[in-house]
């Protein structure tokens, strides 16, 4: 009786959360033909596509040196293709994906405060939760767990957390995005979703065209591709383009 062959998969993420398109699929099929031994594969989730490159190694052929060689080269290959794919088709690097996920973990702790704001018929909830020394401020639509703002602060006590909540409330009520940016980092506010609330019932064509750029700007900032001054300048230009500032 023949023994069943056992294989080890060595994979590395190339680009995550990419909008699928015919051009992208053609590119992947074409490049697959050029790759030796390794190959691309994809996973779909919620309308987005994760692109991964990998290789199968027969277990009985595996050695420590071979594994080190393969892991290093698959990683380099993923990095090279990732830069090209993200530049042309969009998506996130693995580092950017982890940074985003860090801010999407469910909030927990005891709820201390809650305020409500109505914007264009949409009821927004502003809440503060406390767990140990951490105060978490959340802004979300009523009935939704998706957040527009999520910020974690270590402050001296509930009063300081309440002051942050009140400042956030005033900034949102007054459509004061400049003050909001002073209060929170670019990663703590989902500006695309926030803009969508303010533009509800209006023409959002320009906003949708700029969706990719709005999401990418914070990651360009963290990767040093733009300065904070360049980030602020471009986000202000976007707010003018979509009709949310003069």
From Swiss-Prot:
Residues 204-243 form a coiled coil. It comes from the Bacteria. Keywords: Coiled coil. This is Uncharacterized protein aq_171. It comes from Aquifex aeolicus (strain VF5). The lineage of its organism: Bacteria, Pseudomonadati, Aquificota, Aquificia, Aquificales.
């Amino acid at each position: 009786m023949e023994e069943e062959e056992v294989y080890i998969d060595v994979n590395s993420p190339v680009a995550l959360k990419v909008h699928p398109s015919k051009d992208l699929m053609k590119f992947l099929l074409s490049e697959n033909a050029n790759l030796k031994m390794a190959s691309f594969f994809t996973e779909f989730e919620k309308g987005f596509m994760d692109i991964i490159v990998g290789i199968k190694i027969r277990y009985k052929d595996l050695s420590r040196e071979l594994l080190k060689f393969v892991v290093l080269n698959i990683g380099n290959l993923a990095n090279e293709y990732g830069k090209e794919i993200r530049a042309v088709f969009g998506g996130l690097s693995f580092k950017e994906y982890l940074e985003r996920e860090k801010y999407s973990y469910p909030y927990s702790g005891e709820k201390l405060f809650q305020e409500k704001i109505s914007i264009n018929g949409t009821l927004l909830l502003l809440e503060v939760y406390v767990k140990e020394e951490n105060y978490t401020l959340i802004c979300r639509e009523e009935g939704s767990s998706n957040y527009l703002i999520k910020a974690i602060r270590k402050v001296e006590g509930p009063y300081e957390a309440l002051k942050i909540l009140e400042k956030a409330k005033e900034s949102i009520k007054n459509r004061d995005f400049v003050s909001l940016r002073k209060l929170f980092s670019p990663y703590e506010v989902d500006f695309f979703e926030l803009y969508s609330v303010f533009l509800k019932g209006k023409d959002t064509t320009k906003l949708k065209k700029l969706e990719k750029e709005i999401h990418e700007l914070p990651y360009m900032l963290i990767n040093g591709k733009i300065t904070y001054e360049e980030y602020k300048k471009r986000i202000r230009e976007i707010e003018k383009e979509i009709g949310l500032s003069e």
